[in-house]
From Swiss-Prot:
Keyword list, A-Z: Cytoplasm, Methyltransferase, rRNA processing, S-adenosyl-L-methionine, Transferase
EC number(s) on file: 2.1.1.-
Descriptive protein name: Ribosomal RNA small subunit methyltransferase G
UniProt-recorded Gene Ontology molecular function terms: rRNA (guanine-N7-)-methyltransferase activity
GO CC aspect terms: cytosol
InterPro entries from the UniProt entry: rRNA_ssu_MeTfrase_G, SAM-dependent_MTases_sf
Function: Specifically methylates the N7 position of a guanine in 16S rRNA.
Gene it is expressed from: rsmG
Domain of life according to the entry: Bacteria
Pfam families referenced in this protein's UniProt entry, alphabetically: GidB
UniProt: S-adenosyl-L-methionine binding residues: 71, 76, 122-123, 135
Location(s) in or outside the cell: Cytoplasm
Major place of residence: cytoplasm
Amino acid sequence: MEEILKHFPDLTNLQITQFEKLEALYQDWNAKINVISRKDIDELYTKHVLHSLAIAKIQKFEAGTYVLDVGTGGGFPGIPLAILFPETRFYLIDVILKKIKVVQAVAEALELKNVKAEQIRAENVKGDFDFIVSRAVTNMPDFVCWIKDKIKKTNKHELKNGILYLKGGDLTEELQDFPKAKEYNISEFFADDFFETKKVVHVPLKFKL
């Protein structure tokens, strides 16, 4: 939790309380349903919460922004981002119902009114979004195929509407069909060794490819 406060010093008291509650909530749920790797649960704030918040170092979401989190799993990156940006709407989806039930319970416990969670495939989602976020659920070409018709036409941010993707390693081959993609090294923001090879990838997408 100290790392969150270090890198995001302007949190309100409510946000601090919400972030503090995450550990007990996920410890409790993980004992019932394995939504987070057993070896990672003790490093929840670094490997899941702070990792999710790396997106916020690239783009601060304006009020009224609509964000889709594809393959959210236990609620990452969506839940931490929803705490940080209470005036942004987040739609968290996954194909596994038990994970969505955990996300719904966590959002309810934190009283996150800006979160909707649903079991649904990305291809079947209705609506248009400013940004689509995810944590390495598949390779980028396949991911773009899932969500390419779900981007809003009007931009309200410095970054163009599109994908903000958390992934690591050498992405040269994976991104070769996306010349406007840009990689941001998370290690430039967070010093922990865990982030040494981790990146946020921004892929701008035109409306209705």
